Swiss-Prot record:
GO cellular component: ribonucleoprotein complex; ribosome
Position of the signal peptide: none
Family assignment from sequence similarity: Belongs to the universal ribosomal protein uS11 family.
UniProt name for this protein: Small ribosomal subunit protein uS11
Gene3D superfamilies: Ribosomal protein S11
Native source species: Coxiella burnetii (strain RSA 331 / Henzerling II)
Domain of life: Bacteria
Lineage: Bacteria, Pseudomonadati, Pseudomonadota, Gammaproteobacteria, Legionellales
Function field: Located on the platform of the 30S subunit, it bridges several disparate RNA helices of the 16S rRNA. Forms part of the Shine-Dalgarno cleft in the 70S ribosome.
Assembly information from the UniProt record: Part of the 30S ribosomal subunit. Interacts with proteins S7 and S18. Binds to IF-3.
Length: 123
């Protein structure tokens, strides 16, 4: 079977969604077409370990390696969304995969006193 050919995209955008339970990282081209995707759950972490910073770092290293090797990506812009624990470590994982981060953007949605928040946790 022939090896799949990938188009060359030197610059891309990494969209990181960090929730309390998981971290999702997708890499797209500048037009917004998704090239590769990985989550902490897809990297082999299950249960509460998906929401850890280590799970986010492993997932972002995997997706960074995919983008670098398959699409010849060198520079990446990062857009972060969500309050999760894996925000910073996901960016660190992209850097350790050999991608140069050209800018960071925080796109966390903040309500202007919209919906009532869920009840406070009692542990």
């Amino acid at each position: 079977m022939a090896k799949k050919r990938y188009r060359k995209v030197t610059e891309g955008i990494a969209h990181i969604k960090a929730t309390f339970n998981n971290t999702m990282i997708s890499v797209s081209d500048p037009q917004g077409n998704v090239l590769c995707f990985r989550s902490a759950g897809g990297s082999g972490f299950k249960g509460s370990r998906k929401g850890t910073p280590y799970g986010a770092q492993m997932a972002s290293e995997e997706v960074g390696r995919l983008a670098r090797d398959n699409f010849d990506m060198r520079r990446i812009a990062v857009r972060v969304k969500g309050p999760g624990a894996g925000r910073d470590s996901a960016i660190r994982g992209l850097r350790s995969a050999g991608l140069e981060v050209i800018y960071l953007e925080d796109r966390t949605p903040l309500p202007h006193n919209g919906c009532r928040p869920r009840k406070k946790r009692r542990v």
